[in-house]
Amino acid sequence: MERTEKKSIIDTFKTHENDTGSPEVQIALLTDRINHLNDHLKTHKKDHHSRRGLLKMVGQRRNLLNYLKDNQIERYREVIARLGLRK
């Protein structure tokens, strides 16, 4: 992920001016990395090292989504809708 791509994702999902670490931003960045790695694994089927990293990222995103779901359900629903994720 390039710097400009990362900045555009942060600008899209930030909740205030200097926001880089809110759950929404973290989930969006993880989703982008997951999608990129998923494309990589379609062509490199035996890359088990990257597959393990993908599974760790999916688990981390799931934990952040569960946190939002438990504490701020409206923000959770908004993030799910904007990223097109399943519940």
UniProtKB/Swiss-Prot annotation:
One of its GO terms (molecular function) is rRNA binding. Keywords: Ribonucleoprotein, Ribosomal protein, RNA-binding, rRNA-binding. GO terms for cellular component: cytosolic small ribosomal subunit. Transmembrane segments: none annotated. Signal peptide: none annotated. One of its GO terms (biological process) is translation. It holds the Pfam family Ribosomal_S15. InterPro entries: Ribosomal_uS15 (IPR000589), Ribosomal_uS15_bac-type (IPR005290), uS15_NS1_RNA-bd_sf (IPR009068). Part of the 30S ribosomal subunit. Forms a bridge to the 50S subunit in the 70S ribosome, contacting the 23S rRNA. PANTHER family: RIBOSOMAL PROTEIN S15, BACTERIAL AND ORGANELLAR (PTHR23321), SMALL RIBOSOMAL SUBUNIT PROTEIN US15M (PTHR23321:SF26). Belongs to the universal ribosomal protein uS15 family. NCBIfam families: S15_bact (TIGR00952). One of the primary rRNA binding proteins, it binds directly to 16S rRNA where it helps nucleate assembly of the platform of the 30S subunit by binding and bridging several RNA helices of the 16S rRNA. This is Small ribosomal subunit protein uS15. It comes from Alkaliphilus metalliredigens (strain QYMF). The gene is rpsO.
